[in-house]
């Protein structure tokens, strides 16, 4: 959630940026005075992990999972990206680009820098520019999404400024994977699931949300957020198990959809007049306009959240905190809202707690005691315990890659080699091990 391009209410204070990390275990906040990281391990307390005041006007701050690797962009140098080891307070490398940096995405393989009309793909192991996607359709909001999965390492970005085409790019093999005609209107939001095999999309119209298989591009699900009014979708987010999808907008409602395929029952012969009438109604849908038929087939929200505000830009996440499912909403009003979420029953979610994003304590912020209706689930997050450190990096070595269009450089190659990504305890970053 980048707020640098819009005016922010006084209640948000100095907030310029907020985002969850890849597995929703921490929250990054950028402000006019620097940046902070908060742990999301507790509902009752927003524990500050780290605070930096050396860099002012931080409009982008992205953390790699729970490691110490952080990517930073400041309003004072909007074309410059700095990659740092925040626990040591050292800069690993920096790059400068031809235009303002609008978004930065990271996983354990790649770092993506999004400009208005180009995308830069860096190898996160040595920060070298591997590929540049040039002359993309104008993308002033920096809309893009990078899968956090190392094997299905796909990048999605708008393929058109006038209609909702999605370009899917394979960042490992550095080639286009697919073009998905997702919507009639321009895209407003994109999100991969944790496995990198599903992509959720929403258009500027905001009434329909679709989920596609990746890389095939087959439509798997279609959900209707509303009918009466068009809205601006702010955020899409899957749960870590890919069963649920949350969607927030500039309205007061957050919708949570369940990705399930309803098994069709075998047709039964009607035994009453109402049965015959129902069968006639179902048969008549084949003669209705396609738009009306689609509305009959679209899924509805499994659960909803009523936010205490309307009109603020926000981000949402479905997280597991202390083995219980929660919906998190970080908003431009300067607060993090935590709601209960019942993955079995759904329904209306209740506000449990709200925290100020500047980390300050506020009395009477507790809304609801932990309920006996909370259902424990298995932890959905990646393990991210980091203990090992490495020697501080040597001074930055600058180089100009004329064919790739980025001025900058990584630390000396032998120093970058110290970032052993095949060890779980390396800091930063780490490679996920699966059993």
From Swiss-Prot:
Intervals holding WD repeats = 182-222, 228-267, 311-349
PANTHER family with a match to the protein in the record:
WD-REPEAT PROTEIN INTERACTING WITH PHOSPHOINOSIDES WIPI -RELATED (PTHR11227)
Motif L/FRRG motif: where?
A: 223-226
Species: Xenopus laevis
The UniProt entry lists membrane topology as: Peripheral membrane protein
The segments labelled Disordered in the record are 386-435
- Function comment: Component of the autophagy machinery that controls the major intracellular degradation process by which cytoplasmic materials are packaged into autophagosomes and delivered to lysosomes for degradation. Involved in an early step of the formation of preautophagosomal structures.
User: According to its record, what are the GO cellular component terms?
Assistant: cytosol; phagophore assembly site membrane
Q: Provide one Gene Ontology biological process annotation.
A: glycophagy
The cross-references to InterPro entries, in alphabetical order and at most eight, read: PROPPIN, WD40/YVTN_repeat-like_dom_sf, WD40_repeat_dom_sf, WD40_rpt
> In terms of domain of life, where is this protein from?
Eukaryota
Domain remark text: The L/FRRG motif is required for recruitment to PtdIns3P.
Alphabetical keyword list: Autophagy, Lipid-binding, Membrane, Repeat, WD repeat
Query: Gene name?
Result: wipi2
Q: Where in the cell is it found?
A: Preautophagosomal structure membrane
Q: What is this protein called?
A: WD repeat domain phosphoinositide-interacting protein 2
Mostly located where? membrane
Q: Cite a single GO MF annotation.
A: phosphatidylinositol-3-phosphate binding
């Amino acid at each position: 959630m980048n707020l640098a391009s819009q005016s922010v209410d006084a209640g948000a204070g100095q907030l310029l940026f907020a985002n969850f990390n890849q597995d929703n275990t921490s929250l990054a906040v950028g402000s006019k005075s620097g940046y902070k990281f908060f742990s999301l391990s507790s509902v009752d307390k927003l524990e500050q992990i780290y605070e930096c005041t050396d860099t002012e006007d931080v409009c982008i701050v992205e953390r790699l999972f729970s490691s110490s690797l952080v990517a930073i962009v400041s309003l004072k140098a909007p074309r410059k990206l700095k990659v740092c080891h925040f626990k040591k307070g050292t800069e690993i490398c920096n790059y400068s680009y031809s235009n303002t940096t609008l978004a930065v995405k990271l996983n354990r393989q790649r770092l993506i820098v999004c400009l208005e009309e180009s995308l830069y793909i860096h190898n996160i192991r040595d920060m070298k520019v591997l590929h540049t996607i040039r002359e993309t359709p104008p993308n002033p909001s920096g809309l893009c999404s990078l899968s956090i999965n190392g094997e299905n390492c796909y990048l999605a970005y708008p393929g058109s400024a006038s209609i909702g085409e999605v370009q899917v790019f394979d960042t490992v093999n550095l080639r286009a994977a697919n073009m998905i005609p997702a919507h009639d209107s321009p895209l407003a939001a994109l999100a991969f699931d944790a496995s990198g095999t599903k992509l959720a999309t929403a258009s500027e119209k905001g009434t329909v949300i679709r989920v596609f298989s990746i890389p095939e591009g087959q439509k798997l699900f279609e959900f209707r957020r509303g009918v009466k009014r068009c809205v601006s979708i702010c955020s899409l987010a899957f749960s870590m198990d890919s069963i649920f999808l949350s969607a927030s907008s500039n309205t007061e409602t957050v919708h949570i959809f369940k990705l399930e395929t309803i098994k069709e029952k075998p047709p039964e012969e009607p035994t009453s007049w109402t049965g015959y009438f129902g069968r006639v109604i179902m048969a008549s849908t084949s003669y209705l306009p396609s738009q009306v038929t689609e509305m009959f087939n679209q899924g509805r929200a499994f659960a909803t959240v009523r936010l205490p505000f309307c009109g603020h830009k926000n981000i949402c996440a479905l997280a597991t905190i202390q083995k219980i499912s929660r919906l998190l909403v970080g908003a431009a009003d300067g607060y993090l809202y935590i709601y209960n979420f019942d993955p079995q029953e759904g329904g209306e979610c209740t506000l449990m707690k709200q925290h100020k994003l500047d980390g300050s304590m506020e009395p009477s912020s507790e809304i609801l005691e932990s309920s006996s209706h909370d259902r424990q689930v298995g932890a959905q997050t990646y393990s991210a315990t980091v203990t090992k450190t490495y020697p501080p990096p040597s001074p930055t070595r600058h180089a100009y890659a004329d064919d790739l269009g980025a001025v900058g450089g990584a630390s000396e190659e032998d120093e970058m080699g110290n970032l052993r990504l095949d060890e779980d305890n390396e800091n930063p970053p780490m490679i996920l091990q699966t059993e």
